[in-house]
């Protein structure tokens, strides 16, 4: 008997995993715990699926994804917005766990995203540290916003919490520094990125950990991945304004901050920025173009293993 090629969608929740198989229509659920993941792997190994698709769900998908990948099964984690837009485009407006699993299986069959190797244990640890740092930064910002208009007693409490958060952020920065510098490859890439005026430790490490494709893609591909590639909005004879959209939001935010610094202290980006302003571009558009240019430079540096000084002459 010849196995029928199949595609699997898995909807991930805190309590359980809902699984749908296409084209057979088979559906079942398992607990999202160690025993449930073992059952999931065993059943899917028997099916020999062409592709398994899950949504990114803030880390709830990690144990299942790791187990599936370790078992040699082709698994991909996709952006939830992309999956939901696909479901709407196919006419599925209702939303339940079972329906979402079925939509993900359909997505796997039609779109066929390419599986990528899972990051190694050290990369996952570094990403976890960076993610925790982002959480603490958000908490500190919220507390700083609460300072205005509060009583003296509350102000003292908030300031004490901010001081504690500052200490924890500093500790995480030290942990990131120690872990990253312990690896020769990470250390080399970190040094290459930080050699560029405007790219500091936080920006460099965010790019390395949240944009691992940096240095492996073309400049058009990396710009689209981050969300700084200008997108057309044309129809007939109408030529609409170019805009940026989508991509990895946190990477784009950090790159924006690095670009702001680069427009002041990086001679190449500063000159490019000034030329755009003289040409009549508004500052927001000019900064976006500088983000695109800076990202292109960083991508080329990692691809060709060249320092900033060499890259500056080449550009």
Which residues fall in each region the model found?
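Short linear capping/connector segments at secondary-structure termini
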Residues: 120-124, 153-157, 189-191, 236-241, ...
């Amino acid at each position: 008997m010849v196995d029928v090629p199949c595609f699997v969608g898995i909807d991930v929740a805190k309590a359980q995993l809902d699984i749908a198989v296409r084209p057979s229509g088979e559906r079942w659920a398992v607990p999202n715990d160690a025993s449930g993941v073992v059952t999931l792997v065993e059943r899917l190994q028997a099916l020999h699926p062409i592709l398994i698709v899950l949504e990114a769900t803030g880390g709830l998908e990690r144990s299942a994804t790791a187990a599936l990948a370790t078992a040699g099964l082709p698994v991909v984690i996709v952006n939830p917005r992309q999956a939901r837009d696909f479901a709407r485009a196919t006419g599925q407006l209702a939303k339940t766990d079972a329906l979402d699993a079925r939509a993900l299986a359909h997505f796997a069959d039609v779109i066929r995203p390419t599986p990528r190797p899972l990051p190694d244990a050290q990369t996952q640890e570094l990403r976890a540290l960076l993610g925790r740092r982002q959480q603490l930064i958000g908490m500190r910002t919220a507390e700083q916003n609460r300072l205005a208009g509060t009583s003296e007693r509350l102000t003292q409490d908030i300031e004490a919490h901010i001081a504690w958060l500052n200490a924890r952020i500093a500790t995480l920065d030290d942990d990131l520094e120690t872990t990253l510098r312990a690896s020769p490859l990470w250390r080399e890439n970190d040094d290459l990125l930080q050699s560029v005026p405007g790219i500091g430790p936080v920006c460099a490490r965010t790019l390395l950990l949240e944009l691992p494709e940096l240095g492996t893609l073309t400049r058009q591909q990396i710009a689209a991945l981050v969300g700084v590639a200008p997108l057309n909005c044309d129809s007939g004879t109408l030529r609409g304004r170019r805009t940026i959209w989508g991509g990895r939001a946190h990477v784009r935010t950090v790159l924006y901050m690095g670009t702001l610094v680069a427009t002041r202290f990086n001679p190449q980006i500063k000159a490019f920025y000034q030329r755009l302003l003289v040409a009549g571009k508004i500052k927001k558009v000019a900064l976006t173009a500088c983000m695109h240019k800076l990202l292109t430079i960083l991508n080329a540096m990692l691809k060709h293993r060249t320092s900033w000084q060499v890259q500056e002459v080449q550009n």
